[in-house]
């Protein structure tokens, strides 16, 4: 009987040791290191804008030349591009913009339509604004304008002005780089003159590609304005007849450009 008890005790001790070894030697299911690769991060996926359809230019029933692009889609695209680079959205929903109704705002040279304007701080007039001109029914974008107050033409506001304009263009041409835009902006500014207060300002030159016209308007006492506007052949002809230089295609940072001066075949 004593031998039986000794053998039973030895067996229990062996089982306890074996169980303890198993418990200490391998992590539990709750702490076990993952054996599969982590999910693929979003940054390794194609950018969202690769699935975007090109934006066409159309004319609505009221005869307004516009992009086939709603304000909501513009905001979604703009914020997608901005947040990919800066980690947050820039533009609020349209109902948080200042609504000036139908007109041309106080800006000469702009389109007549339903006017909206936004700044991150509405009381800071040194901050460059972004404006949307929509069709009078408010459902399609006609033009986008970035504006810079001439009284605050210093490095900070000017940089933000150009950056807001860049992302406006990227809504239509997502692959446009900052270096490309700097090349474009330099060429828009070259030999540009400020119109007198009583004159209707005209751009020195217009760059045009796939229905999108981009140009700079300068006038004494007004905001410096970079326009991204829906355009067609009739508008290009009108500009050219007024002496405006039309350049087909946007320049790139490597010095190339699509199209030639005066070539505005659509």
Which residue ranges define each predicted feature?
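Bacterial N-terminal signal peptides that target proteins for export
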Residues: 2-11
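C-terminal motif of bacterial Sec signal peptides marking the signal peptidase cleavage site
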Residues: 20-23
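Bacterial signal peptide processing site
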Residues: 25-27
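N-terminal low-complexity, Pro/Thr/Ser-rich intrinsically disordered segments
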Residues: 33-92, 252-254, 259
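Compositionally biased P/S/T/G-rich terminal and signal peptide-adjacent segments
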Residues: 45-59, 121-142
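A cross-family detector of function-defining hotspots
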Residues: 88-131, 178-219
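Long, charged/polar, surface-exposed segments that mediate recognition or autoinhibition
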Residues: 126-193
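Non-cytosolic coordination micro-motifs
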Residues: 167, 171-266
């Amino acid at each position: 009987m004593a031998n039986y008890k000794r053998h039973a005790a030895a067996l229990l001790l062996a089982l306890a040791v074996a169980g303890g070894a198993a418990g200490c030697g391998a992590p539990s299911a709750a702490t076990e290191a993952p054996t599969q690769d982590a999910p693929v991060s979003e940054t390794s996926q194609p950018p969202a804008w690769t699935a975007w359809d090109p934006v066409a230019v159309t004319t609505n029933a009221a005869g307004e030349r516009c992009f086939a692009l709603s304000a909501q889609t513009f905001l979604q695209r703009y914020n997608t591009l901005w947040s990919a680079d800066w980690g947050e959205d820039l533009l609020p929903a349209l109902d948080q913009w200042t609504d000036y109704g139908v007109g041309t705002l106080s800006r000469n040279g702009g389109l007549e339509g339903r006017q909206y304007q936004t700044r991150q701080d509405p009381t800071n007039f040194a901050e460059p604004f972004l404006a949307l001109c929509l069709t009078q029914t408010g459902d399609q974008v006609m033009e986008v304008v970035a504006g810079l107050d001439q009284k605050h033409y210093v490095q900070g506001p000017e940089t933000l002005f150009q950056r807001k304009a860049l992302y406006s263009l990227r809504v239509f041409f997502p692959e446009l780089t900052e270096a490309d835009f700097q090349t474009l902006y330099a060429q828009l500014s070259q030999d540009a003159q400020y119109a007198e207060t009583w004159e209707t300002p005209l751009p020195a030159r217009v760059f045009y590609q796939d229905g999108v016209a981009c140009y700079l308007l300068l006038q004494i006492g007004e905001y410096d304005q970079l326009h991204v506007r829906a355009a067609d052949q009739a508008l290009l002809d009108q500009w050219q007849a007024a002496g405006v230089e039309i350049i087909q295609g946007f320049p790139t940072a490597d010095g190339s450009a699509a199209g030639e001066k005066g070539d505005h075949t659509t």
